């Protein structure tokens, strides 16, 4: 099972390294033709506006939507979660995006890069041991649709991980920690 990693901008190399460490073959996805060689896809963190523009520039939006609608598992981390969200709060209405997951992503929910933080929280489906979560200019997920399952909440109740069918969104960066559980969870979806 080859895991595609959208490699237009952002921290795709960190995801690639984590997947290699756990033995999963990877392919950097930059063009629509690359999608035919992958069974699942990670959309990494980075800058959601920039990644969205690059998705449009390289003709990836429609092929990605089609593959995801056909059931290809996809995981968006941070900016990737924003790009998966049907609705984007605090974003531009014309921002290129996939708009597939029935959630609202609130961009930069914690403020600037100076307000970045780490916290240990439980994640549904990962066992009892809390997961180290790294938040960097991170969004939160709001207005979850009926078919969306929240997987992790901050202490104040805000949702920072959710799943809808074969779509997974995390507002934090599991690839920046040594913990493999989120990547293994995605591979098992």
From Swiss-Prot:
The annotated pathway is:
Cofactor biosynthesis; pyridoxal 5'-phosphate biosynthesis
Q: Which residues bind L-glutamine?
A: 46-48, 107, 136-137
- Reactions the enzyme catalyzes: aldehydo-D-ribose 5-phosphate + D-glyceraldehyde 3-phosphate + L-glutamine = pyridoxal 5'-phosphate + L-glutamate + phosphate + 3 H2O + H(+); L-glutamine + H2O = L-glutamate + NH4(+)
Which residues are catalytic?
78, 173, 175
Q: What is its EC number?
A: 4.3.3.6, 3.5.1.2
Where does the UniProt annotation place the signal sequence?
none
Alphabetically, the GO molecular function entries are: glutaminase activity; pyridoxal 5'-phosphate synthase (glutamine hydrolysing) activity
Q: Does the keyword Transmembrane apply?
A: no
PROSITE patterns in UniProt: PDXT_SNO_1 (PS01236), PDXT_SNO_2 (PS51130)
What's in the keyword line of the UniProt record? Glutamine amidotransferase, Hydrolase, Lyase, Pyridoxal phosphate
Spell out the InterPro entries in the cross-references. Answer: Class_I_gatase-like, PdxT/SNO, PdxT/SNO_CS
Instruction: Give a Gene Ontology cellular component term annotated to this protein.
Output: glutaminase complex
Question: A GO term (biological process) for this protein?
Answer: pyridoxal phosphate biosynthetic process
* Function statement: Catalyzes the hydrolysis of glutamine to glutamate and ammonia as part of the biosynthesis of pyridoxal 5'-phosphate. The resulting ammonia molecule is channeled to the active site of PdxS.
Family to which the UniProt record says this protein belongs: Belongs to the glutaminase PdxT/SNO family.
Quote the PANTHER family the UniProt record gives: PYRIDOXAL 5'-PHOSPHATE SYNTHASE SUBUNIT SNO, PYRIDOXAL 5'-PHOSPHATE SYNTHASE SUBUNIT SNO1-RELATED
Q: Which HAMAP family match?
A: PdxT
Q: Give the record's subunit note.
A: In the presence of PdxS, forms a dodecamer of heterodimers. Only shows activity in the heterodimer.
Q: What is this protein called?
A: Pyridoxal 5'-phosphate synthase subunit PdxT
**Organism this protein belongs to:** Roseiflexus sp. (strain RS-1)
């Amino acid at each position: 099972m080859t895991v595609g990693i959208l490699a237009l901008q952002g921290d795709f190399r960190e995801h690639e390294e984590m997947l290699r460490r756990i033995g999963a073959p990877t392919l950097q996805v930059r063009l629509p033709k690359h999608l035919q060689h992958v069974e699942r896809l990670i959309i990494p963190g980075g800058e959601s506006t920039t990644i969205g523009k690059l998705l449009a520039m390289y003709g990836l939006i429609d092929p990605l939507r089609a593959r995801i609608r056909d059931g290809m598992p996809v995981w968006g981390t941070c900016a990737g979660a924003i790009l998966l969200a049907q609705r984007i709060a605090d974003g531009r209405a014309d921002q290129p995006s996939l708009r597939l997951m029935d959630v609202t992503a609130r961009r930069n929910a914690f403020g600037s890069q100076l307000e970045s933080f780490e916290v240990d929280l439980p994640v549904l489906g990962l066992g009892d041991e809390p997961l180290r979560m790294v938040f960097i200019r991170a969004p939160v997920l709001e207005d979850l649709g009926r078919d969306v399952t929240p997987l992790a909440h901050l202490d104040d109740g805000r949702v920072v991980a959710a799943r809808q069918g074969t779509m997974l969104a995390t507002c934090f960066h599991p690839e920046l920690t040594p913990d493999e559980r989120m990547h293994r969870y995605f591979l098992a979806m």
